[in-house]
C-alpha cells in the first residue's frame, strides 16, 4: 500500500496506469496483476486512505480514477517512517554480517 499511496500522492491515476507506473518506476521489479491491485485499492478505499471518481476520456472510455485523501497522506507519512526504521535495521544487520564475514575471511587467509 505504501507504493500505491506514494504514486497517488503525485497525481490521480486509474488502475492500469498505477500498474504501469509502478512497473516503470521500479524498473520492472514490481509488477502488480489486476487480481492483486484491485483488492488493495478497495481496501485503501474502505480505510478512507483513497477515494475514487469516474472520468470520461476524450476517446469515450470511462475510467475510474483514484486519489489520495488527507487521511491517506497521514497514513503514507506513517508508512514511510515505519519503512525507514525497518530498512535501517536491515541495513545495520547486513552491514554487521558483511563486516563479520570479511573479518573471518581475512583471518583464514
Task: Identify the residue ranges that each predicted region occupies.
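Amphipathic alpha-helical recognition patches that constitute DNA-binding helices
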Residues: 3, 36, 67, 71, ...
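Beta-hairpin "wing" of winged helix-turn-helix
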Residues: 45-62, 67
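N-terminal helix-turn-helix DNA-binding core of bacterial DNA-binding proteins
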Residues: 1-36
Amino acid at each position: 500500500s505504501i507504493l500505491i499511496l506514494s504514486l497517488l500522492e503525485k497525481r490521480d491515476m486509474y488502475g492500469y496506469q498505477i500498474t504501469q507506473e509502478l512497473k516503470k518506476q521500479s524498473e520492472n521489479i514490481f509488477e502488480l496483476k489486476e487480481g492483486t491491485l484491485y483488492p488493495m485499492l478497495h481496501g485503501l478505499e474502505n480505510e478512507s486512505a483513497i477515494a475514487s471518481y469516474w472520468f470520461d476520456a476524450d476517446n469515450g472510455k470511462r475510467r475510474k480514477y483514484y486519489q489520495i485523501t488527507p487521511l491517506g497522506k497521514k497514513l503514507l507519512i506513517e508508512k514511510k517512517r515505519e519503512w525507514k526504521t525497518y530498512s535501517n535495521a536491515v541495513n545495520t544487520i547486513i552491514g554487521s554480517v558483511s563486516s563479520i564475514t570479511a573479518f573471518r575471511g581475512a583471518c583464514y587467509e
